[in-house]
Amino acid sequence: MSVYDLLIGQDHIVETLTAAVNAAASGEESQEMTHAWIFTGPPGSGRSSAAIAFAQALVCKQKGCGTCNECITAKSGAHPDIEILKSEGLSIKIDEIRELLTRTAWAPSMGGWRVVVMEDADRLTESAANALL
C-alpha cells in the first residue's frame, strides 16, 4: 500500500513525486525542497489527488507508506501539518490568505514539513494573490 495508489495511470507523476520526497528526505543541501509545486491539468485529471498524495508522502517517516499513523491521519484529513484550502465561494479572499499565512508560520507539529494544498488557486483575488506572494 502507498499514498500514491489512487494515482492510476500516472506512473511518471508518481516517479517524479517519489524522487522529490526521497531527495528532500536525504537532507542534502543540494536536494532541498522547493517552496511551492503547481499541479495543473483539466478537471478530473487528478491534480488534487496527486497534490494530497505528495503532501502525505512528505509527512510520512517512510516517505509515503500509506499504513503508518502519519499516513492514516493525513488520509483522514486530520493531520495537523497538512491543510487543504478550498474556495468557499466564487473567490479566495485576502482574509483567508492572511489567516493561512499565520497558520503556516507555525513549526510542523508531527514531522519536518507543513504543507498547504490550495485547490482552485485561480480563484484568488488580486489582493489575496499579492498577500500570498
Language-model segments: which ranges?
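P-loop/Walker A NTP-binding region and its immediately flanking N-terminal helices
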Residues: 1-127
